[in-house]
Amino acid sequence: MSESSEKTGTTHFGFRQVAAKDKKTLVAEVFTSVSRRYDLMNDLMSLGIHRAWKRYFVATAQVKSGDRVLDLAGGTGDIAMLLKNRVGAEGSIVLGDINASMLSVGRDRLIDRGVVAHLDYVQCNAEALPFQDKCFDLVTMSFGLRNVTDKDTALCEMFRVLKVGGQARVLEFSTVTAEWFKPIYDFHSFQVLPRLGRLFARDAASYRYLAESIRKHPPQEELQAMMGAAGFERCRYRNLTGGIVAIHSGYKY
């Protein structure tokens, strides 16, 4: 079930209940604020492990040379950079992000690293993708779905633009599975992380929201069911690092 309420027109922004129409603006303010320090944010949130998670996410994707890939919530280009090696010179990647600041950081970073060929940048909303039906072999979203207002619609859009036989993959912070670890994780998320955000980025509020958004994100089984409801088949998930993150995948047949 999507986090938006059709009856009240409200949704969650972290632990706050806000008008659904306002969430995009509030999320945009967060990511505009953290865009120049996005990698630092991920390091603080994951204790630096996010790079290994992303490498595994791409390494286990169904993608081959010549494929056309859509990377949603492409951020600073980490996933696109890894995918470029998989699709090769014959393939292409579209890096999409709703936030112009994030997209700019990603473009500059990839250009600085010499990654320019067969790579397009599109500012787009995952709930209303500006692409034709059945035009991508793989659709990925890394650490972005929890910030989407209507997750069900976004998953349906991912399904729509995917070719028959293609795969969608979502890498996202999830629900920790080890009971003994939950108090430690909560302490890091709600006590340590905002203080680090204030110290290194002068922005405790954005980091507090990001921690809260993880707790409001659907747990593994629920998100798997949501992907099935969007039309995907063979929906699976794999927990990494005790469920701190999970990789969800589904196919279009």
UniProtKB/Swiss-Prot annotation:
Record-given protein name: Ubiquinone/menaquinone biosynthesis C-methyltransferase UbiE
Gene behind the chain: ubiE
GO molecular function, one term: demethylmenaquinone methyltransferase activity
Keywords (A to Z) from UniProt: Menaquinone biosynthesis, Methyltransferase, S-adenosyl-L-methionine, Transferase, Ubiquinone biosynthesis
EC nos: 2.1.1.163, 2.1.1.201
Record-linked InterPro entries: SAM-dependent_MTases_sf, UbiE/COQ5_MeTrFase, UbiE/COQ5_MeTrFase_CS
Entry keyword annotation includes S-adenosyl-L-methionine: yes
Family: Belongs to the class I-like SAM-binding methyltransferase superfamily. MenG/UbiE family.
Functional note: Methyltransferase required for the conversion of demethylmenaquinol (DMKH2) to menaquinol (MKH2) and the conversion of 2-polyprenyl-6-methoxy-1,4-benzoquinol (DDMQH2) to 2-polyprenyl-3-methyl-6-methoxy-1,4-benzoquinol (DMQH2).
Organism classification: Bacteria, Pseudomonadati, Pseudomonadota, Gammaproteobacteria, Lysobacterales
Pathway annotation: Quinol/quinone metabolism; menaquinone biosynthesis; menaquinol from 1,4-dihydroxy-2-naphthoate: step 2/2; Cofactor biosynthesis; ubiquinone biosynthesis
Superkingdom of the source species: Bacteria
One of the protein's GO biological processes: methylation
Pfam families recorded: Ubie_methyltran
Binding site for S-adenosyl-L-methionine: T76, D97, N125, A126, S142
Keyword Disulfide bond part of the UniProt annotation: no
Reaction equations catalysed: a 2-demethylmenaquinol + S-adenosyl-L-methionine = a menaquinol + S-adenosyl-L-homocysteine + H(+); a 2-methoxy-6-(all-trans-polyprenyl)benzene-1,4-diol + S-adenosyl-L-methionine = a 5-methoxy-2-methyl-3-(all-trans-polyprenyl)benzene-1,4-diol + S-adenosyl-L-homocysteine + H(+)
